[in-house]
């Protein structure tokens, strides 16, 4: 699946400023706890592709970003 990476404790997206190819987003996406294949910055948040179905993405159910 694909989607915005989400911080499980805050319910917020992973923010980014360098749009498009983004090393930080790519690294976060490919981290063992996320399991994605490619990440980049889209609309100032990290978008991730190739995620396993088990990885939560934004928005988290019952948790709004605060």
From Swiss-Prot:
Entries under InterPro entries matching the protein: LCN-type_CS_alpha_beta_dom, Scorpion_toxin-like, Scorpion_toxin-like_sf, Scorpion_toxinL, Scorpion_toxinL/defensin
Family matches, as Gene3D superfamilies: Knottin, scorpion toxin-like
Subcellular locations according to the entry: Secreted
Keyword field contains Disulfide bond: yes
Cystine bridges: 12-65, 16-41, 25-46, 29-48
Residue ranges of domain LCN-type CS-alpha/beta in the record: 1-66
Taxonomy, superkingdom: Eukaryota
Keywords, alphabetical: Disulfide bond, Ion channel impairing toxin, Neurotoxin, Secreted, Toxin, Voltage-gated sodium channel impairing toxin
GO MF annotation: an example: toxin activity
GO biological process: defense response
Tissue: Expressed by the venom gland.
Entry GO terms, CC: extracellular region
Pfam family, one: Toxin_3
Function, in words: Beta toxin that binds site-4 of sodium channels (Nav) and reduces peak current (observed on Nav1.1/SCN1A, Nav1.2/SCN2A, Nav1.3/SCN3A, Nav1.4/SCN5A, Nav1.5/SCN4A, and Nav1.6/SCN8A (IC(50)=44.9 nM)), shifts the voltage of activation toward more negative potentials (observed on Nav1.6, Nav1.1 (weak), Nav1.2 (weak), and Nav1.7 (weak)), and induces resurgent currents at negative voltages following brief and strong depolarizations (observed on Nav1.6, Nav1.1 (weak), Nav1.2 (weak), and Nav1.4 (weak)). This toxin is only active on crustaceans.
Remaining remarks: Negative results: does not show inhibition of peak current on Nav1.7/SCN9A (at 560 nM). Negative results: is neutralized by the single-chain antibody fragment 10FG2.
Family: Belongs to the long (4 C-C) scorpion toxin superfamily. Sodium channel inhibitor family. Beta subfamily.
Free-text comment about domains: Has the structural arrangement of an alpha-helix connected to antiparallel beta-sheets by disulfide bonds (CS-alpha/beta).
Name the UniProt record assigns to this protein: Toxin Cll1
UniProt organism field: Centruroides limpidus
Taxon lineage: Eukaryota, Metazoa, Ecdysozoa, Arthropoda, Chelicerata
């Amino acid at each position: 699946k694909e989607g915005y990476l989400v911080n499980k404790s805050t319910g917020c997206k992973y923010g980014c400023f360098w749009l498009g190819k983004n090393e930080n987003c790519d690294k976060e996406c490919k981290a063992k706890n996320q399991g994605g294949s490619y990440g980049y910055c889209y609309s100032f948040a990290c978008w991730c592709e190739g995620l396993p179905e088990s990885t939560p993405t934004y928005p988290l159910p019952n948790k709004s970003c605060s």
